Regions:
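Cap/insert and terminal regions of metallo-dependent hydrolase folds
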Residues: 258, 262-359
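Active-site environment of divalent metal-dependent phosphoester hydrolases
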Residues: 57-58, 80, 132, 163-170, ...
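Active-site metal-binding motif and surrounding structural segment of the metallo-beta-lactamase
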Residues: 135-186
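Bacterial N-terminal signal peptides that target proteins for export
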Residues: 2-11
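Active-site neighborhood of phospho(di)ester-bond hydrolases with catalytic His/Asp-centered motifs
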Residues: 124-127, 156-163, 186-188, 246-249, ...
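C-terminal motif of bacterial Sec signal peptides marking the signal peptidase cleavage site
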Residues: 19-21
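Metallo-beta-lactamase
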Residues: 23-150, 154-157, 181-184, 188-246, 265, 271-279, ...
């Protein structure tokens, strides 16, 4: 290759403010990138202090204002390696470094459900895998209910965050009847239509085989609930003190629910209570420090990222108590901004969830 002409050399020198400045700028950029990645790894280590719990069929209870929450552990699910289930829009190297920093390379996480005693009713949020479980490690919400001394027929209302089988499956019995015979089942109309139609899961990182399984199981479970479903939409108050919030991306009709002060139905009151964030994210140790990392189960990844960033910012500002679908059980606490990574977050678990063993 020919050496730069004097004219080109002069242009490069002027553009950089001097050749040394070009070199220094490149070094500074590299150092900045390395510093940012180190901050991300440190934030992952901080988030990883909260560890997934083993076992299944457990229950504990605590009170948040006038809401009694019973946290149920359906079990532990395994989606394979961390990458590409998390961070497919990043790089494999960065995600694997984060996994090593977290001390876990597998995509393992808890599956949670909750019962709320609120306004004189017993309300179930999601139902775990139920009889659709792929193995004995999940499918134990009913065991948790027994530990809490709650019978299925005592549940007055069920609120479904979305139609993935680890949330929907436990709402029906093995012979495909409603598992909670006296309850109405609340969900988004768009979610029902999605699973009853021809769901497009092509933007997920889930294998084609498992996509087909999710479609078949989702439709089968939805069919079993026909005639018992009440549809809700963004901003609806299906019960006094309960408000639905549309948080699409994970699925088209993915909903959050807030449970506010007794008898209240305004949005402000709902935000002052406790909120279920569904599958806003799966693996808090990676996606709280890096909310812009794609979730492999998101139907619409870009929307999922935007909604995750929006909701996390709101929760950090409000300090509203949250319930979660997949954070380490019991998965109840608050979200705050990370002190290590400015655009990251940290989960602060609630204390005092007393384990129940009534049998």
């Amino acid at each position: 290759m020919n050496a730069p002409t004097p004219t080109l050399r002069l242009f490069l020198t002027l553009a950089c403010g001097g050749l040394a400045a070009c070199a220094n700028g490149g070094v500074a950029s590299l150092q900045s990138s390395e510093t940012a990645e180190q901050a991300s790894l440190d934030a992952v280590r901080e988030a990883s202090r909260i560890r997934m719990v083993s076992g299944a069929g457990r229950a504990c209870e605590l009170s948040v204002g006038d809401v009694r929450v019973v946290a149920l552990l359906d079990g532990v699910t395994d989606t394979g390696s961390t990458y590409p289930f998390v961070g497919a829009n990043s790089t494999k190297r960065k995600v694997e470094r984060a996994a090593r920093a977290a001390g876990r390379t597998e995509a393992l996480f808890n599956v949670n459900a909750q019962v709320l005693e609120f306004n004189g009713q017993l309300i179930l949020i999601d139902g775990g895998y139920g009889s659709f479980t792929p193995n004995e490690k999940t499918g134990h919400v009913m065991d948790g209910l027994r530990a809490a001394g709650i019978r299925p027929e005592e549940i007055d209302a069920v609120f479904l965050t979305h139609g993935h089988i680890d949330h929907l499956g436990g709402l029906v019995t093995a012979d495909r009847r409603p598992a909670f015979p006296n309850a109405r089942y609340h969900m988004a109309r768009s979610e029902y239509d999605f699973w009853m139609g021809d769901p497009d899961l092509s933007q997920t990182t889930i294998s084609t085989k498992f996509q087909d399984t999710l479609k078949q199981q989702g439709r089968e479970a939805m069919m079993a609930l026909q005639g018992r479903i009440s549809f809700v939409d963004d901003g609806d108050t299906p019960l006094p003190g309960v408000r639905a919030f549309a948080v699409p991306g994970h699925t088209p009709g993915h909903l959050n629910y807030s449970f506010g002060a007794s008898g209240a139905s305004s949005a402000a009151d709902a935000r002052s209570g406790i909120r279920h964030i569904g599958d806003l994210l799966h693996m808090q140790q990676f996606q709280l420090p890096n909310p812009d990392w794609q979730d492999g189960a998101d139907t619409y990844p870009e929307i999922g990222i935007a909604e995750r960033e929006r909701v996390l910012a709101e929760l950090a500002a409000s300090q509203q108590m949250v319930m979660t679908g997949h954070f380490p059980w019991p998965g109840i606490g608050t979200v705050r901004r990370s002190d290590i990574k400015p655009d990251g977050y940290v989960f602060v678990p609630a204390t005092g969830c007393n384990e129940l063993t009534r049998g």
